[in-house]
Amino acid sequence: MTYDKIILGAGLYGLYAAQKCGAAGQRVLVLERDPAPFMRATYINQARVHMGYHYPRSYSTAIKSAHYFERFCNDYGFCLHTEFDQVYATSAHFSWTNAAEFRRFCAAAGIRCDDVAPERYFNPGLCDGAFLTTEYTYDAQILKRWFLEQLAALPNVEVLYSHKPTAIEKVGSAWRVQAGDITAEAPYLLNATYAGVNDVHAMLGLPPFGIKYEKCEIILCTVDKSLKNTGITVMDGPFFSLMPFGRTGLHSLTSVTFTPHETSYDSVATFPCQQECGGVCKPGSLYNCNECPAKPQSAWPYMSQLARKYLKEEYGFAYHSSLFSMKPILKASEIDDSRPTVVRVMNDEPKLVSVLSGKINTVYDLDEVLEV
């Protein structure tokens, strides 16, 4: 079969591209190795729609996040949870950024930052500033249903699940992709596989993105009434976040120190657990960590202890469940904690574009390369 575009990956970036190109009349094929869309990073993350507060050491990342925040809210407001207080605080110890610097950063970025008394939320002496901000959380399952409804109305878009590409080759002015029982060709290939981006590059003999891989855990928590409508993020160092997880009624707990269980610096993700998973995962072919028989033990004892050290006792929370996923991070980002979206044209004819982004609302960066 011949298409205008073949898209690898049915996360947000893949389905956004499919919907946009399909609505323009293009014939699109999406290939997803999992049995359903949004099974990995689009679902398994903090679900934070970034306004930029997270990046006081990377003004460029903050500005881009703020720029796209309003557009994302307008386009996908139906999946957002907006009715809660999002509190950012700066730790009095071991933080790269203090309260005064955070205020200056927010003023420079033009984003809301209203002082609140740290002792309202935190134990004495632990935070030198606390701020009410404007930031929301999205519900990946609601967003997924919307995209599937949109794509179902486009007969020129086909999405195939449980179809992992096994071979990709250049044939004249097209890419030929084999996946499962199908062979498809298109003059345009979009690599939107996120943590699998270098797996595709390796198949084609292309240079890898310079990334490290973190095997990450998001802990879902039930919370006391006092926390139900509040999100807490303590900056800017080895701290934590506890905030609503979309519209699920649960909160996500993450920690800079304990959310990443292991890190791989190889060009394709390589971890000891791949020797213990019964062959379902290997370097160059990442399985879904959340479904893996070799997924790690929860870091709940460490994360919860850290959060309880900071939070006043009245803000209670309890373990519900854990979600695991692989997070690729550009090695260059280790210096300033930036999270640039990389959209790179790897080949002109036939066209191959690879995208890597750790933020939901910078999906619009794809617009400049989709050719619609």
Regions found by a protein language model. Give the residues of each.
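N-terminal Rossmann-like FAD-binding beta1-loop-alpha1 element of flavoenzymes
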Residues: 3-29
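Glycine-rich FAD pyrophosphate-binding loop
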Residues: 22-43
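Central helical "cap/lid" subdomain
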Residues: 38, 182, 186-235, 245-250, ...
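Dinucleotide-binding Rossmann-like beta1-alpha1 core, especially the glycine-rich loop
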Residues: 46-129
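Helix-loop-beta segment of a Rossmann-like dinucleotide-binding subdomain
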Residues: 80-90, 116-154, 158, 176-177, ...
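Helical element adjacent to the flavin cofactor pocket in flavoenzyme catalytic cores
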Residues: 131-188, 192-202, 363-371
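Flavin-binding catalytic cores
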Residues: 260-327
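C-terminal catalytic lobe of FAD-dependent flavoproteins
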Residues: 301-372
